[in-house]
Amino acid sequence: QRHFSDIPNKKLEMPVYSDSLFSNKEVPKFHHVESVRDRDVLKISFDMPDDMPFWESKPTQFLAHLLGEEGEGSLLSYLKGKGWSLGLETSTWWRMFHIKVQLTDLGKEEYEDVIRACFSYIQLLKEEGLKNYIFEERKKLADIELKYIEPKSSMGRASQYSASMLYFPVESFLSHYYLYHKHSQEDFEKFLSQLHVENMQVS
């Protein structure tokens, strides 16, 4: 406020983008790209609603955590057990959610089975929901991470934080940005419901 209070607030309305990224039926579901690296990656991408208004429950972060787990019973452990995958990661950016699977030679041949396995695991999440103990674990870890937050470039942090301040209360910005404030099964299911075949692209 000390540095920016002289800038007039024009109270402009935020633009709303309601069209689905993958709603056009003429857009191919599958894209094959020759890799310049010595590895093959299967990427399943989903169009998602804007998750910033859901900062209290952070549903996309739980989706990324649950689908990206590496322990026993995880999606990755199943794919590795089949000899299809060397690694898996999830990511979110704006209105996109990605599942990236690093394929073995066998996984490349049987990529359709890899996709089916991903959707089987998504169905399992729909049946089980977001369990309270998982929320509490992530909540405690976030508390610790904020307490011992690693320094990063001032420019990068300023850009990241200033954009997020459109959604978070300025007075308690950091806690709202990093921490989990409520366990919402409804929010989790809202975003989980977007992970379906009609709403995906594969590359």
Label each PLM-derived region with a short phrase:
Residues 1-203:
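Mature, solvent-exposed C-terminal subdomains and processed small-chain segments of exported/organellar
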